[in-house]
Amino acid sequence: MLSCSSKDERGAKLYKVHCSSCHMLPDIQDLPKNLWEQSILPEMGARLGVQDSLFDPLKGHPYSEQYAIIKSGVYPIKSSIPKQNWKVLKDYILKLAPDSLPLSPMTKIDQFTNFNPKSVNIDSTNGAFISFLSYNKQNKRIFCGDINGNLVSYDHSTKEVKSLLQTKQAITDYSESTEGKIVTHVGYMNPSEIARGNIQIVNDSIKELPFTLHRPVANLVKDLNSDTIPEMVICEFGNLTGSLSLLSKRGTGGYEKTTLLNQPGATRVIARDMNGNGKDDLIVLMAQGDERVLIFEQNPNFTFNLRPVLQFNPLYGTSWFDLVDYDGDGDQDIITVHGDNADNTYIQKPYHGMRVYINEGNYKFSEKFFYPLNGATRFVAKDFDQDNDIDFAIISTFPDYERKPEFSFVYLENKNSEDFIFNTQISDISNLGRWLLIDSGDFDSDGDEDIVLGSFTYSFTPVPNNMLENWEQSNTDLLILENTLKP
């Protein structure tokens, strides 16, 4: 028989060994006991090869998906932990797990007056399923794609909606380069181990590249090695497996695919010279378990050195990041938001929100500010009021729609950059749509920065029936927030 103290010590050791091999070690206190027992432990057990009556990773999937799940190797047939140790580990976690989580602290809030909301309907149907959104500064148009494969552009000055493409798959990225118009299709929107995504290059005709991609959610098209030919860096988010991939054009005219990172969760990639050697490095956000920000340093021979710079708790639900010189010292700081809650641990989580990491040199970034916001998923960081500091506009796709739906969009007006003092402003625009995407730009050419929100009215998580009905009947696909700074 093990004593209580020795059993706890054994449990602590097992927790460190088995719960930090694939990602940062989470704090047991970060989830309530019922979610550990009903969701996390059964999933974790399956990944250790432990049979559990509460969870079968193959159940409910068609045979093709089952085959792909088995092929991934994520759920081994043979257990890697003895039954006695598994029981000790489970007992240890459930003993320490809290019954509930504390609520996020409330901050003083105001109604925002800096922006004037304007609804935009880009099609003839109610409801919205915008899967891609980006503002193009060169032609002053907003580009958006939906899950039905429709790509349109919108000119806010003339109110013109122009249909560009009609494809058959959900669009997750679009860009224009010397190669043509490049359209990225995700394949399966819902989590899947089956790769069905693709890239099409549109000129006079449509050419589909000969690569099947695993749920690509972003595609950076840029000439990285200064040979005048753009490369593509593709975030194949995947599911149980995935990758960060590089497509380079060969002398024969075709593309060659290289895997930069064999890991699921690639969400966004930015090209920026981070070490001052004149070459674009790749800064990448990884989600899906091992949540990190990575820098791929570009070498002279167009290879890359991997430098991990930030790692997050796997329960954070890391969703987005950007590089911003927040403190005005000439280098790039990292801003992140955490709040993806579309999984089997859905509760309001006090560690969701926005974090500011200041660049201290030599690839060291230190967290200096945290703004709590349940379900925070994306943001834009600009000087919206033109007072020489960085303000933030944040969307939450997973707010507490039952009690605080107005927190689906939050504007943080910077009052003191050094001390991180912000005026929190909200507006109840949640009835118009479920905000999934955000971008900004001077849409009306009046000299200030406006904001655009893209709606995706699918119900990922619990939402009041009256709000669902409003979304289904709404004709708001995009919501323009016109900055009122310049009349």
Predicted segments — roles?
Residues 5-13, 17-487:
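Beta-propeller-forming repeat regions
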Residues 1-2:
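Sec-dependent bacterial lipoprotein signal peptides
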